Amino acid sequence: MWRRLIYHPEVNYALRQTLVLCLPVAIGLLLGHLQQGLLFSLVPACCNIAGLDTPHKRFFKRLIIGGCLFAGCSLVVQLLLAQAIPLPLILSGLALLLGVTAEISSLHARLLPASLIASIFTLSLAGNMPIWEPLLIYAFGTLWYGVFNWFWFWLWREQPLRESLSLLYRELANYCEAKYSLLTQHTDPSTALPPLLIRQQKVVDLITQCYQQMHMLAANQRNDHKRLLRAFQMGLDLQEHISVSLHQPEEVQKLVERSHAEAVIRWNAQTVAARLRVLADDMLYHRFPQRFQMDKQIGALEKIARQHPDNPVGHFCAWHFSRIARVLHTQRPLYARDLMADKERRLPLFPALKNYLSLKSPALRNAARISVMLSIASLMGNALHLPKPYWILMTVLFVTQNGYGATRVRIIHRAAGTLAGLIIAGLTLHFHVPESYTLSGMLLITLLSYLIIRKHYGWAMVGFTVTAVYTLQLLTLNGEQFIIARLIDTLIGCLIAFGGMVWLWPQWQSGLLKKNAHDALEADQQAIRLILSPDPKAPALAYQRMRVNQAHNALYNSLNQAMQEPGFNTHYLEDMKLWVTHSQFIVEHINAMTTLAREHTMLTPDLAQRYLESCEIALQRCQQRLDSDGPGSTGDVNIMESPESEVPIGPLSTLEQHLQRILGHLNTMHTISSVAWRQRPHHGIWLRKISR
């Protein structure tokens, strides 16, 4: 029972965050320096935003960099304010100076908002204490945060990675159940496919997250991570065999009518899903897995395959489920390979600075957007006669996310949570509760807020707002008079952040659709080249298959985010959803062909070359259609006909059937894009016609 409690992801996270915040307050209370303890507890907020609690092979190096940036920004703000430099200029300069971190890596990019938050915290401290005291608070606060988190992760044995792997296995179980229930149900594809695509998107997102964590921990170089690395590679093999599709609904219908295949397939899928959920719990709660076999289920599938040798569905299900069963039985991947190389870009400082100084740099646009928003917030504070508008500035930074949709949702949750929290705090302040009870209540509220923050950010904001008001009350003894002002400041900050995301150099996801579609087609092309090569190696096939899945997932994510953006053309949306659906079918065929190529199911060299030429022509045709700014025509000459005409007529092998279907999907995608491209949204000048 205690394992399920202490290792539960939400409970473990809430305990860690609550202890790292509240232990300094408790020590300050015991030593008679409660105010210093409360100020010390502000530093973990900066560290959380900077991601300094991320398990990393350079954990303490990142900690030192973060602490130096926090203390340095605090010193700069205090010195410049002492010289009467306007606050908008100070914050704008810091934002533009620190924006280069986004060019180094995505993890370094989180140092920008965290350092700005540290600067804004300094506004409330400047003039109330010596100039060196905030520097010590940030330095020792960051050190405390790092040492505590290092000890916590050592104590719980890399719990974040276990949580990600557990989520991956659980999502694979849900995906397996949903996929094979659709195989035996007569469901309209237009309604059945979107939920399945969402599940597959979650699986690939979790795989990408696990890759990032593995590389950050250098898991392939550490003996204590080999078991988790093996579990991750097992998950990759399971995803490969679960995600393949036959795409022969008429054959499925024939087999279901002639046998009890529907019940047997569902039995196998449910058995696999149940075992995956058990393994997910075993990883999360640090248990050794028990022995597992599903010989009866596989035997029933093989019997159906023998009874209906002319129907490919039985052989398809028996073969893939037998591979899944082997992975689950042996608790090992199907074949040995190293971890796929990390594709995360990391630049040294000076090359990153060179890229940052380009007007095309997304990092520069993001830093400029933040600097303008902070300047407007500072000027708004001056207009409202607020010498230190730190609440407006913090609200702007807290609600600003990477995209329009995420920022809009965060603004709604932040505003609603802050409003409710201020009302509750305003009512409870009238009761004049003793300090000991107040601190105990703040501890409980903080724990409950961290328990729900991952899934219910708005409700968590209610608790955090209450604790913030009571912190002001304990520090200044006049928290009640801040309530109305803080509500107005929150609304102003949310409006500034929303306006900045819409009007200040926005990066619309609809503008990235073309790039992501290009990347997906390019990944498909490389995978087909590798599969049809004379001697494809198993590790290379596995790496390229995952790149195909990740490229399609990026396209699917950008389409989902673009659907929430303003000014989106509904006709274009429907057409692009259909385009992405056909792209997903190609991914499933590549998944299936990868397993065939690894088992040395090959074509003759001449036939492989003809199919490769056909596929490359079709892929290039789709890419050229995306590059063209003209309306296009759906009646273009099919340039795939010539290579296809040389393919012998007769029974096709399984690999040839997959290739033929890929060609059909590419032809349909070209037709769709010819129609859809005229209706694409124009958010700024993001597509330019190249005149020759």
Positions of predicted regions on the chain:
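Long, hydrophobic alpha-helical segments that serve as membrane-spanning/inserting helices
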Residues: 1-15, 22, 26, 30, ...
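Hydrophobic faces of alpha-helical transmembrane segments in multi-pass integral membrane proteins
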Residues: 15-23, 27, 64, 68, ...
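Structural signature of hydrophobic alpha-helical transmembrane segments
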Residues: 27-42, 76-93, 134-140, 380, ...
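Core alpha-helical transmembrane segments of integral membrane proteins
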Residues: 31-32, 346-447, 466
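C-terminal ends of transmembrane helices
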Residues: 45-57, 98-105, 399-407, 445-453
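Short helix-perturbing small/polar motifs within transmembrane alpha-helices
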Residues: 73-82, 90-105, 120-126, 149, ...
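Transmembrane helix-loop junctions at the membrane interface of multipass transporters and ion channels
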Residues: 110-134, 469-486
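Generic detector of multi-pass transmembrane helix bundles and their immediately adjacent loops
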Residues: 430-571, 577-580
